[in-house]
């Protein structure tokens, strides 16, 4: 199944702009390039192993989704993919789906994880999914904060060195308030960035300073 959706401009927490859209099969080379730019730590936190290269079988599965039981979004800075998020339904007609995302090192800490989670949850609800589940290493504090800060009612279990999270993705007043607050702060930073002086220009002075 294919689906055409417009590219969405996304304002990040630092006031910069990226774009988000559903993944495409033609994204495979860009996904490989992004993976090569990851630090060893980023790879380990996402895949729970060194995972130096993406096997062809995994790559094919990553970029081919049905937009119902499996969905994925990519985030682009210019023409370069810098993040990807996905969910996959746990079984036929299951109300649960596993969610995961990874952000290139240079773009971490700018709110991309929260943006991906929001769009994935919206898409999942339209496909009849009720709950997200996630497995996160305890060392991945940034990922745990993304889930915790979103306002979802999260159930946590720790087993075999992994934090297991389960949470309903229906909007609540808490999640909507978090989204509104994030949008307000992001817009404020964007305006401040736009109005920040780029330098001082002295009018009426020649290049030699002689008037």
Can you say where each PLM-predicted feature lies in the sequence?
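Long, contiguous binding/interaction regions
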Residues: 1-193, 197, 203-206
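Glycine-rich phosphate/diphosphate-binding loop of Rossmann-like nucleotide-binding domains
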Residues: 209-211
